[in-house]
Amino acid sequence: MEEKFYADMITHSFDSIDTFIQTANEVLNRRKSRAGKSLEHHLSDIFVHNALVFEEQAVTEDNKKPDFLFPNGKCYRNIQFPAGDLIVLGAKTTCKDRWRQVLTEADRVDVKFLFTLQQGISKNQLKEMHDSRLTLVVPQKYISSFPRDYQDEIKDLLGFILMVKEKQEHLPKHYFL
């Protein structure tokens, strides 16, 4: 795909190293953005297939938009809806420091979840996540790549789906209309 957008530019010489670096960064950022959106689309398909009620990019406080809000933004904005039945899931191909963004996306939700494909996150970062009440969700086969002390705190995707289903099964159906 990058060839389509950048072939002409690449075949001509760059005016400077800065121009080359700027172009390389644009290409990398486009790739990262596509990978992130692809991950969100795959998760969305999985959630639909599992009959979960959710909304993508629902607006919360200060126009913030978590990747996934269970059950939806309408329930989130309804002060009568039990906050303990709201679930927020961020989706990041890699965490780095961007995991902190998930913490600020929905004030009504105490414990937030982050799905990632990144393996082997450091103990220090896992401790920070735990202390910030953020639970990692990863593919089941990735759990063994994390420090043993934290493996029990990490959910696999199936466990996350079952948790959401359990919460949603006990909610009155009028919330989903």
Cite the ranges covered by each PLM segment.
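Catalytic core segments in nucleotide and nucleic-acid processing enzymes
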Residues: 41-44, 48, 53-177
